């Protein structure tokens, strides 16, 4: 067995579960349950980070982008769980030190673990979003501990997203989030590209709360994660600076929820459909974003499914 698999199977506290026939079903009811599940998934990664903590090499399976982006992706994606954990009052000193060191090393052009100079349509821009959201919501973990030089390096590395072309689709939110993050910590950002990205996102709106993912007309579980989810995050991050759009995105989320609820069964199970097959954990992200943004489009007892 691969060592990572061994650690996953035997490490960390177990969330509660129950059996439904031959199927093991997790019974997640409390914050502690979800915290235990997060640790179950992420704790096995701790010994796998690179020496400088900026990279994770988790296997040899292939993707369409290069090894640099693969290892950055593995570094950044755990932040989608760790940042809410920190914002909710959680603490894990080991992960906090890993990400402090990793951000410093990965953004340092003189460091062998530097994430590099980006180009057109670069996968690195996708991974910037998690870092940006971390800076926006948990700066005391991901920004404040950095030295002045490390902050300048990280801002410069993130700022590359403003110097290159990105796809005309949900990727616009990555540039939006990066610019919001840079602005929030007093670093150079592009108000012009921030507004341009928001205008593009607005152009995707198709009515009744729905948006398309750019020019694509398909509708699947990816859309709520790629558009509505980030829209709700924006509505909270920019509530004071862009109240008109913040209110608009919340209104659209209210409309969207009335239809999207029927994409889940009474137990919360979702259909194995579309691009969503590789993003199963993101299928319910819209509902989590609603709660975090203080929005209750449906009774909480129903959302809790």
Task: Describe these PLM feature segments.
Residues 9, 303-305:
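Conserved small/polar residues in nucleotide/adenosyl-binding loops
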Residues 25-73, 97-102:
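Low-complexity, Ser/Thr/Pro/Gly-enriched N-terminal "stalk/linker" regions
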Residues 291-303:
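Extended polysaccharide-engagement surfaces of secreted carbohydrate-active enzymes
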């Amino acid at each position: 067995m691969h060592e990572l698999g061994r650690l996953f199977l035997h490490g960390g506290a177990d969330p509660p579960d129950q059996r439904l026939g031959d199927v093991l079903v997790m019974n997640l009811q409390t914050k502690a349950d979800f915290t235990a599940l997060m640790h179950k998934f992420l704790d096995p990664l701790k010994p796998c980070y690179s020496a400088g903590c900026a990279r994770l090499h988790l296997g040899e399976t292939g993707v369409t982008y290069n090894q640099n982006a693969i290892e950055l992706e593995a570094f950044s994606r755990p932040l989608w769980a760790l940042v809410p954990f920190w914002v909710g009052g959680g603490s894990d000193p080991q992960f906090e030190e890993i990400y402090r060191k990793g951000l410093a090393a990965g953004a340092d052009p003189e460091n062998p673990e530097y994430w590099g100079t980006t180009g057109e349509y670069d996968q690195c821009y996708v991974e910037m979003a998690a870092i940006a959201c971390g800076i926006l919501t948990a700066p005391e973990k991901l920004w404040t501990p950095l030295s002045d030089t490390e902050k300048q390096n990280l801002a410069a590395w993130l700022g590359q997203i403003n110097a290159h072309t990105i796809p005309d689709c949900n990727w616009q939110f990555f540039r939006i989030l990066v610019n919001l993050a840079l602005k929030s910590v007093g670093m150079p950002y592009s108000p012009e590209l921030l507004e341009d990205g928001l205008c593009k996102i607005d152009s995707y709106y198709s009515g009744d709360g729905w948006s398309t993912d750019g020019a694509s007309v398909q509708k699947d579980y990816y859309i709520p994660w790629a558009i509505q989810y980030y829209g709700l995050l924006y509505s909270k991050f920019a509530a004071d600076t862009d109240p008109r759009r913040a209110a608009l995105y919340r209104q659209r989320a209210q409309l969207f929820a009335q239809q999207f609820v029927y994409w889940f069964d009474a137990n919360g199970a979702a259909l194995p459909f579309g691009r969503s097959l590789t993003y199963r954990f993101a299928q319910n992200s819209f509902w989590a974003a609603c709660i975090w943004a203080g929005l209750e489009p449906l009774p909480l007892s129903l959302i809790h499914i």
